[in-house]
Amino acid sequence: VAAPGGINFAEVKERFTKGTASGELLVISGLAVNEFDYPVARVRLRGKILDGAGKMLGEIETYAGNLLTDEELNRLTDKEILAELQRQEGSDMPNVNIRSRASIPFMIVFTNPPKEVDEFIIELSGVERSAASN
C-alpha cells in the first residue's frame, strides 16, 4: 500500500518576460496541492532548469505563497526577486495551515537563464506539519 500524502503540483505554467532591472526572466508558476490528510506549512519548492541532454543548468528554492506582479518583475533586481520569493510565511498567501486538499500558489523565477534551457523540473524541497493540526 502506497503511503498517503504529499504535495502535488497543478496548473503549472512557464513564460519568458523581460525585466528592466534584472534582464530576461523565466517565470514558472502554479499551485502546490496538499495531499496529506493534515494541514501543512512552509511549503518549499526547488526549481531546476535543464538542457536538452538533461544536464542541470541551474536551480533555485522558493516558498509557496509568494507571487510577484509583472510590474514587480520588471522593476526588481534579481536579488530583490529572490528575496521576495524566499519569504517562509508567504507574502501574498499565508504559507501556514494549508488544509488537506487545499492549494497554495507558487512562483519560481530564473533570471537570465541560459539559452540552452530545454525543460524545467519542480520538486518539493521541504514541508512542515502545521502547528494548527491536531
Predicted regions and their residues:
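Short structured motifs
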Residues: 11-16, 29, 89-94, 106-107
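Asparagine-centered strand-capping/turn motif at beta-strand->loop junctions
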Residues: 32-36
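A short beta-turn/strand-edge loop motif at beta-sheet boundaries
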Residues: 37-41, 116
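The feature marks short-to-medium sequence segments in extracytoplasmic or secretory-pathway proteins
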Residues: 41-89
